[in-house]
Regions:
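Transmembrane beta-barrel wall of Gram-negative outer-membrane proteins
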Residues: 1-57
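Short, glycine/acidic-rich beta->alpha junctions
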Residues: 12-14, 99-103, 211
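C-terminal beta-signal and terminal closure region of outer-membrane beta-barrel proteins
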Residues: 205-211
Length: 211
């Protein structure tokens, strides 16, 4: 159960979820995952909310299936120095008061530039769209985590409805990293790295005037 009570931002949201997932190696380095999830979403708006946000208030239930594939060619899982990992995941509605389809694609590539420098390039894109004219609920909209867009607070990038950041139908991020594992003595137990992040969250299907 997740409670996202933000009366100062115009809404209070409680989300209860349960699910089962399994993952297995379909072929060498190619993994598949299957899952089933059920959720109950209780969204309440306050007087501070915009009229368009108030229209989204209510109780919503859903049962969704998800599947995905992951091609993992990294030389090791923890702190890789070579190889790549590519993944795709999709969520499909089985039953939902407001149906949606979500797609997520991510790719990372690692290479050791020198003995003391490991480069990483990462790409992420995610989209969620309503089905049959339904609008995507607030709890299902896309945000970027602080790992994908560092230096910004989570949930503070993207479309705003009045003063409220409501997330988008689309999110994308591109990251460049340089890890310097041998810069400091091992006794310090400190990792040093450089990064450059680009990201964006956009799209508000329930109100085309929102940017």
């Amino acid at each position: 159960s997740t409670s996202n009570d933000k009366p100062d931002q115009g809404y209070e949201n409680t989300l209860v979820t349960a699910g089962v997932n399994t993952s297995f190696e379909q072929y060498q380095d190619l993994f598949a995952n299957l899952g089933l999830s059920a959720s109950y979403d209780d969204l309440r708006t306050t007087g501070a909310a915009s009229d368009s946000l108030k229209k989204q208030s209510g109780d919503f239930s859903e049962l969704a299936g998800n599947y995905g594939f992951r091609l993992d060619k990294r030389n090791r899982t923890f702190m890789p120095t070579d190889g790549s990992i590519i993944s795709f995941n999709q969520v499909l509605p089985i039953y939902a008061d407001k149906s949606y389809i979500a797609n997520t694609f991510a790719a990372s590539n690692y290479n050791q530039f020198t003995e003391n420098v490991v480069n990483a390039t990462k790409f992420y894109v995610s989209a969620v769209n309503g089905v049959g004219g339904d609008h995507v609920r607030l709890s299902k909209r896309r945000f970027l985590s602080t790992k994908r867009l560092r230096g910004f607070k989570r949930g503070k990038v993207g479309p705003r409805d009045g003063l409220d950041h409501v997330g988008g139908n689309y999110a994308a991020a591109l990251n460049f990293e340089a890890n310097l594992p041998n810069l400091l003595p091992e006794a310090t137990k400190t990792d040093v790295g450089l990064f450059l992040d680009f990201g964006n969250v956009w799209g508000a299907d329930y109100d085309s005037s929102i940017e």
